[in-house]
């Protein structure tokens, strides 16, 4: 009932739900949980998000692979389709784009198994994530893609408070300024913690777990 709905400036088919409260991500404490579940799981909404992101990313010379973080594979598949509709080139011999998801090891580093490595090594990659609050996950993901021999061409996120990371513009459908009052803090500086207000939930790119 406390949920607030915010629509994208580019499309009235694309909306995120924000729930006010006290939430913890792996890197920060935030005063809104940004729920983009429907954008990731409903086909028509995912397709529209992909269309908006494709417009925002603009022209990319080569796209071979889209690396999907936080359960964004459905959006990633439609984003690949958007690129293939245009005059984008690919170095893939089969002339179609890979859509892959990494595993994360115990140190939260990207892990691509041997059967997936060929879709990264020497390939032109677009990194797609769901929600970016500090940019640390994007930073680690860029490091991982580089480690496996991929060349990142663009970075996209459905929601991001970060405009740039490691020299890449973060192309996002929603930014912090689209959510009036949204704030992220370090755990040490969190005003809720200082007042002794308990956490409502722990959140990550996949969703939330109430405490």
Can you say where each PLM-predicted feature lies in the sequence?
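Active-site-facing substrate-recognition patch
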Residues: 1-62, 205-211
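PRPP-dependent phosphoribosyltransferase catalytic core
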Residues: 1-9, 142-211
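Short amphipathic alpha-helix with an adjacent loop that forms part of the alpha/beta core around
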Residues: 57-59, 113-119, 187
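Short, well-ordered alpha-helices that flank and scaffold nucleotide-derived cofactor binding pockets
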Residues: 55, 81, 85, 143, ...
